[in-house]
């Protein structure tokens, strides 16, 4: 079973405490120390090798994610420089004894689809086969082929990636659910129509809700732990 969590605050020793509090639920952690420079090359933020070793002793895989953080230009620079970027990712994985990479590049369009797929192909080719490649993809309940949903060729991405991680959240633009059951189910069903093995499909769950202003698109994210602790 694949159970992973992103981690957005580097990889300090406090991370070990957070992981231990999950009581063995996780088997993969994905910290945020892969960034994209403005020229499309890799920026590696500090990662503590001793912390990585401590996670490995806990039988956890360490698979950092690479994201453009919704910056379309940055994502396109990465694709234009994809040969070098794939090699740099491979080198970082080897140097730090990491277990793979999660690619989380968003807000591209159907015009970028082929280059994005080729980037994933290059990443898969550049790193050892036993290392993991996963790709975060848009939830697409209505099968859109234009806009940022259209940047993901689900069928061909699955040929190179070990896992496709469906980002089943941020459903509503106005006041509404973050991830309603019907919307999530349709998103899963669509991916499965794209000739993808169910074993490669990972469901991304939101650890947050939203506080909406009526009639406005603006909202404030509220982490789940605040809701549970009744501090929200």
From Swiss-Prot:
Its EC number is 3.2.-.-. Disulfide bonds: none annotated. It comes from the Bacteria. InterPro entries: Chitinase_II/V-like_cat, Glyco_hydro18_cat, Glycoside_hydrolase_SF. Pfam families: Glyco_hydro_18 (PF00704). GO terms for biological process: polysaccharide catabolic process. Keywords: Carbohydrate metabolism, Glycosidase, Hydrolase, Polysaccharide degradation. One of its GO terms (molecular function) is hydrolase activity, acting on glycosyl bonds. The active site is at residue 106. Residues 2-232 form the GH18 domain. Gene3D superfamilies: Glycosidases. Belongs to the glycosyl hydrolase 18 family. This is Putative glycosylase YkvQ.
